[in-house]
Amino acid sequence: MTLDVDAQKKDEKLLLSTIQQEYKILAEYKMIESEKVSGIYVIPSYANSLQWFGVFFGRQGFYENSVFRFSILLPDGFPDDKAVPAIIFQHNVVHPLVCPYTNSLDISHAFPEWRCGEDHLWQVLKYIQAIFADPLDSIRSVANIQELSNPEASKLLNTNRDAYAALVQESIVESKSRVYDTPPTEDPHYIVFEKFQANVHGPVLDQIRKSRNTIVPAESGVGGAATGLSWVKVKEGDFKPLSIE
C-alpha cells in the first residue's frame, strides 16, 4: 500500500511539473507574439512542445530573399535547465556559425548558458535575425576562427566576399527549391507552403488589395497587381500571406 501511495505521489508531482513547464513554454510563445519578431515564423509542435517548427525569411545583405526552415529543440528541463535550445536548419545553410555537417546553429556566443527568467526564445530569434543581417559582425568577437562551426565560410567571408556570396546563393536556391516538398512529419503544426491557387488564395489577395487601397489611398493605381505572394498553411483550410517577393 505504501508503495502504491508513493508511486501515486510521484506521478502527481510529475504531472504538476509537466503542466508548469507547458505554461512556461506557452508564455515564451506569447512573448514572441508581443515582441513582433519580423521575418521569422515559429510554432510549437502539436505533438511535443519541446520541438518547434520555424521559417526564416532573409530581407537584406547576403541572405536577401532566402527562405530557411529550421527546428528549435528545447532541453527536457526547459526553461530551468542551463542547457541552451538547439537550432537546426532543415537544409544546408552557409554561415560561419552553422555546422555544414549537422546544420546546427551555434548560439553559445550569445547564450553560453540558459538563464531562466532572463533569457527568452524571442531573444534567440532576434539573434538569428542579427547573424544573417550581418554575418561578419556576428563573428567579430571570435579570436580563433577554428572555434567556429564553419571556419571555411568564415575565411571566405573575410577574404573573398564574392565567393562567399556565391556559396550563400547556392544554399538559398536549394532551400527555396524545396519549400513545397512533402512535409517530413504529419504534425498538424508543421508550417506548410502551397503554391498560389486562384480559387483558394484569390479572395484573400483581394482583401489585402482592398485593405491597402483603404489605408493608403494615394497608392491606388500605382505599380499594378502584386505578385509573388508567399503563403503558409498552419492547419487545414487556414492560409496566411507571409510576404511579397
Curated annotation (Swiss-Prot):
This is Protein crossbronx. InterPro entries: UBQ-conjugat_E2_core (IPR000608), UBQ-conjugating_enzyme/RWD (IPR016135). Belongs to the ubiquitin-conjugating enzyme family. FTS subfamily. Pfam families: UQ_con. It comes from Drosophila virilis (Fruit fly). Residues 20-177 form the UBC core domain. It comes from the Eukaryota.
